[in-house]
UniProtKB/Swiss-Prot annotation:
The keyword RNA-binding applies. It comes from the Bacteria. It catalyses: tRNA(n+1) + phosphate = tRNA(n) + a ribonucleoside 5'-diphosphate. Homohexameric ring arranged as a trimer of dimers. It comes from Burkholderia mallei (strain ATCC 23344). The gene is rph. One of its GO terms (biological process) is rRNA processing. This is Ribonuclease PH. It is an enzyme of class 2 (transferase). InterPro entries: ExoRNase_PH_dom1, ExoRNase_PH_dom2, ExoRNase_PH_dom2_sf, PNPase/RNase_PH_dom_sf, Ribosomal_Su5_D2-typ_SF, RNase_PH, RNase_PH_bac-type, RNase_PH_CS. One of its GO terms (molecular function) is 3'-5'-RNA exonuclease activity.
């Protein structure tokens, strides 16, 4: 998978975009990250609230939830704010639930105690892969937030059990490729989003044949690409948190 002429960006089929993770991007939230997957840029914040949803009252455990949104001009043409329309789109609800599920997969909510960690992922520029960038950045923001809780003595230990990151893969021009940008995503035959832990466990796989159905062989190739890409993202998360 070394053919770079296949992809509009000139990347190899197995090559991520340039990924940057900038911590402490804003000053108020307990965790605040700017994550960049090429030209896709997302601000991810983690905020701690000393309360839990009603269904968790008196159970002593915590909760983690996520919200996702896009600025009106994050894409090629301006879109109205969802608040102005009075409701969230189905896509927005799907993505924020995915982010929440992905992060809860690596959290011991009992260790978090009776508090809620709110993750807010705001896309300031979109060029494909906003949900996968959000998950990858939100983990780092959440890690910073719980580190502060431990340092302040509000919890005895970190509730984080592993790393988690996400990446898109797809079949573009008949070839499995890693980390689709907008040009590839809008023209691919297959689009798949994969969420995995640092230990290599699958948290979620979302795959759709946009054009021709994909074979089991292609699916295996896509998952291999995703696993390698997520391994690199976890390395970048570790490096950011150790900086």
């Amino acid at each position: 998978m070394t053919n770079s002429s296949l992809r509009p960006s000139g990347r190899r089929a197995d090559q991520l975009r340039d990924v940057r993770i900038t911590r402490h991007y804003t000053k108020h939230a307990e965790g605040a990250v700017l994550v960049e997957f090429g030209d896709t840029k997302v601000i991810c914040t983690a905020s701690v609230a000393e309360r839990v949803p009603e269904f968790l009252r008196e159970r002593g455990q915590g909760w983690l939830t996520a919200e996702y949104g896009m600025l009106p001009r994050a894409t090629h043409t301006r879109s109205d704010r969802e608040a102005a329309r009075g409701k969230q789109t189905g896509r927005t609800q799907e993505i924020q639930r995915l982010i929440g599920r992905a992060l809860r997969a690596v959290f011991d909510l009992n260790a978090l105690g009776p508090r809620t960690l709110h993750l807010d992922c705001d896309v300031i520029q979109a060029d494909g892969g906003t949900r996968t960038a959000s998950i990858t950045g939100a983990f780092v923001a959440a890690h910073d937030a719980v580190t502060k809780l431990v340092a302040a003595g509000r919890i005895a230990r970190s509730p984080i059990t592993d790393y988690v990151a996400a990446i898109s893969v797809g079949v573009f021009g008949g070839t499995p490729v890693l980390d689709l940008d907008y040009d590839e995503d809008s023209a691919c035959d297959t689009d798949m989003n994969v969420v995995m832990t640092g230990a290599g466990g699958f948290v979620e796989v979302q795959g759709t044949a946009e054009g021709a159905p994909f074979s089991r062989t292609e699916m295996n190739a896509l998952l291999d690409l995703a696993q390698a890409g997520i391994g690199e993202l976890v390395r970048l998360q570790r490096a950011a948190l150790e900086a």
